Amino acid sequence: MFTNNNNYNLTNGNIITLNNITPIANVVTVSNGCIESINSPNNDYESIDLGGLTVLPGLVDSHFHLSNFGKRLEMINLKELKSIDQIVNKVDKKIKELDPGTFIHGFGWDQTRWDNQEFPTNDILDYFVDNPIILTRIDGHSLWTNRAAINLSIYDDNLISPDGGDIINQCIFIDNAMDAIRAIIPKHSIEDTTRWIKTASHQAMKWGITNVHDAWQDPL
């Protein structure tokens, strides 16, 4: 069904136009990514039989965080992992792809999905000594870090919990305790933001989202 051509007719489809005069079309003709015509196929173009599939206009998301979503896509996805071993394997694989000293970011771990349902201990990520690791819990209220990250922060070996925060097992930083860890993360560059926007845009288009209104964006 897919084509590498820039010009084609989509035929035999349930094509919803959102046009009151012709709400449903059978054929839509596309040229260089733009709709050329409805129900008037161009005989010089390749025709693709949709087999009755439905075609919708591109969706517009009115509240999107484009660069942040792209940034999240580059993080290790921990949402579906059900054990510490699975997380360690993901982290180990990511580290092997990057240079020493590169920050490792992950998102989505949830100890309530694990067998013991307890917060991890510091020895687990401290095994990785060459890369600062910062893994954000599913609710965004806790960070799981290693000693390589902690040593870059203002925390000393005593790891005293600040007001409004807590530190558990010398590696879990909760609420206000996260601030000093987040402060060590290198400021992103224009190149980073550009890459995140492109990554997020490609994923959004796969979902049929062709326009977004970014709800919040840092100045470039």
Language-model segments: which ranges?
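Divalent metal-binding segments
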Residues: N6-T11, I16, N20-S31, I35-S37, ...
